[in-house]
Amino acid sequence: MAAAGAAATHLEVARGKRAALFFAAVAIVLGLPLWWKTTETYRASLPYSQISGLNALQLRLMVPVTVVFTRESVPLDDQEKLPFTVVHEREIPLKYKMKIKCRFQKAYRRALDHEEEALSSGSVQEAEAMLDEPQEQAEGSLTVYVISEHSSLLPQDMMSYIGPKRTAVVRGIMHREAFNIIGRRIVQVAQAMSLTEDVLAAALADHLPEDKWSAEKRRPLKSSLGYEITFSLLNPDPKSHDVYWDIEGAVRRYVQPFLNALGAAGNFSVDSQILYYAMLGVNPRFDSASSSYYLDMHSLPHVINPVESRLGSSAASLYPVLNFLLYVPELAHSPLYIQDKDGAPVATNAFHSPRWGGIMVYNVDSKTYNASVLPVRVEVDMVRVMEVFLAQLRLLFGIAQPQLPPKCLLSGPTSEGLMTWELDRLLWARSVENLATATTTLTSLAQLLGKISNIVIKDDVASEVYKAVAAVQKSAEELASGHLASAFVASQEAVTSSELAFFDPSLLHLLYFPDDQKFAIYIPLFLPMAVPILLSLVKIFLETRKSWRKPEKTD
């Protein structure tokens, strides 16, 4: 009986050892990998090497220029050399990590018969009308016509002319260095119509270090897929003024044609409102000499905040909002004028704030009060108002007057208020700005994800990053090829994808879940199971070690 009991006990101990080893094997072989897999932070692969390469990206902005020579514009020996191509390239000196080079590819050729006929007409406007082709030129391209040195197409004191479309006229010269002299003139005209240091500096104002001209360069709106424009009539004294403004007709006649011409740069929505009892929030000063009130330049920044609280247009907007306010001063503070820094009245009686909008003060004619009972009827002259607002709108979009070369004649404004080459110049600037923004966003995202290892990177986030990198590369290639329209579209895609990836909410899911919290959660689960297994393994190890050391019995 004793032998049978000892055998049973030995069998039970062996069974316990095998069970402990089995549980330990299951925990190590299956449990640990399963726990590791189910608790790991999923991080999809990202193109880190390509993103780091974007910091050394060099932009080559190619402007295709077709140069058409008429008869007697250059010496006959030079005309026999046509056609040929000349490339002029220079680096734009900006304090920015991205190197930008501007490349003017000038394709020289002789004028065709219909071009000769058009350029021999009496005025440059007639020539432009005859040269209009059914098929428009590509965005970003230019055509320069070189006319005879003694041609009457331009005033005799003018050496060049910039038209409303993508065309210009330059006087030729009978000189042995004609091509070199004319080539320099063409580059000056082409730069005024496309890319200059100031245009690109304004586009990269948020990415460049502060300097003496940064404040002015930061005036234009940042690039966006859409913009909202709000026209507001502020009538602080409705008891004295019954103001009527035909804002719908004014927008239809003046603003909408301009926005239609600007449509390639983004989507636009326009609305209007009338605000009663809306005060400027600044007490104007009285000038006894002129019996009028005035706002000096130093008080203008304090005007916007009190008024902005009444507008309510930017609170729920996804896009940048431009506010244009027409303020009819109350009777007690009429007439009201805006003074410049020298104390002189501003001719337009208006001012604008960078990336916000503009305000115009509209004074009621004093004669209106003499023969009328309050409130007086006020008919707003919308032509005068829209001239001011459209000028401010151009400035806020970065469409400023170009720096013309010497003796250059600029075409008058078009009915849309925007020349075709001005739109191209805006698209150049917006493309560069978008690439800089996308590159900065991707670089910041890569640095953030590299430093914090417990941020989840989902596949859709990685997909947006890959899209953004590909779009940046495509846009840079299209810019180098002179395809402005497709380059601008690709740059917009780059910004959109990079910001979708950077601001994806899933990146924050485990950001505030440190390792000590993980231990606090998992130890109560694993400790009750792990302790018996570990103790059994230790006991088995000690018994096995003891049996190895036990000496063999000898007779």
From Swiss-Prot:
Pfam families: PIG-S. Residues 2-18, 533-555 are cytoplasmic. Changing Y276A: No effect on function in GPI-anchor attachment to protein. GO terms for biological process: attachment of GPI anchor to protein; GPI anchor biosynthetic process; GPI anchored protein biosynthesis. It is found in: Endoplasmic reticulum membrane. The keyword Transmembrane helix applies. InterPro entries: PtdIno-glycan_biosynth_class_S. Changing S272A: No effect on function in GPI-anchor attachment to protein. Residues 40-517 are lumenal. It is linked to Glycosylphosphatidylinositol biosynthesis defect 18: An autosomal recessive disorder with onset in utero or early infancy and characterized by severe global developmental delay, seizures, hypotonia, weakness, ataxia, and dysmorphic facial features. Belongs to the PIGS family. Component of the glycosylphosphatidylinositol-anchor (GPI-anchor) transamidase (GPI-T) complex that catalyzes the formation of the linkage between a proprotein and a GPI-anchor and participates in GPI anchored protein biosynthesis. This is GPI-anchor transamidase component PIGS.
